Amino acid sequence: MAKPPVRKPKKKVCAFCKDKVTYVDYKDTNMLRKFISDRGKIRARRVTGNCTQHQRDVATAVKNSREMALLPYTSTAR
């Protein structure tokens, strides 16, 4: 039997580029929580759809936010 053709998933659009955001603020924890998994890990670019530069900015902002105790390093869920 022949396999059906494989469809490529649609490329996700960077939310920051779409909204023309120039600065990712580490104090905006509601926005940063979208880029953190339930275990507290920073989600990958292929999952979030961010471009390279904004993914770097998000990672830096999350790390700064953790350092300032605005976001947890790990989750309490087990």
From Swiss-Prot:
<protein>
    <recommendedName>
        <fullName>Small ribosomal subunit protein bS18A</fullName>
    </recommendedName>
</protein>
<dbReference type="InterPro" id="IPR001648">
    <property type="entry name" value="Ribosomal_bS18"/>
</dbReference>
<comment type="subunit">
    <text>Part of the 30S ribosomal subunit. Forms a tight heterodimer with protein bS6.</text>
</comment>
<keyword id="KW-0699">rRNA-binding</keyword>
<dbReference type="Pfam" id="PF01084">
    <property type="entry name" value="Ribosomal_S18"/>
</dbReference>
<dbReference type="InterPro" id="IPR018275">
    <property type="entry name" value="Ribosomal_bS18_CS"/>
</dbReference>
<dbReference type="GO" id="GO:0006412">
    <property type="term" value="P:translation"/>
</dbReference>
<dbReference type="GO" id="GO:0070181">
    <property type="term" value="F:small ribosomal subunit rRNA binding"/>
</dbReference>
<dbReference type="InterPro" id="IPR036870">
    <property type="entry name" value="Ribosomal_bS18_sf"/>
</dbReference>
<keyword id="KW-0689">Ribosomal protein</keyword>
<dbReference type="GO" id="GO:0022627">
    <property type="term" value="C:cytosolic small ribosomal subunit"/>
</dbReference>
<keyword id="KW-0694">RNA-binding</keyword>
<comment type="similarity">
    <text>Belongs to the bacterial ribosomal protein bS18 family.</text>
</comment>
<comment type="function">
    <text>Binds as a heterodimer with protein bS6 to the central domain of the 16S rRNA, where it helps stabilize the platform of the 30S subunit.</text>
</comment>
<dbReference type="GO" id="GO:0003735">
    <property type="term" value="F:structural constituent of ribosome"/>
</dbReference>
<keyword id="KW-0687">Ribonucleoprotein</keyword>
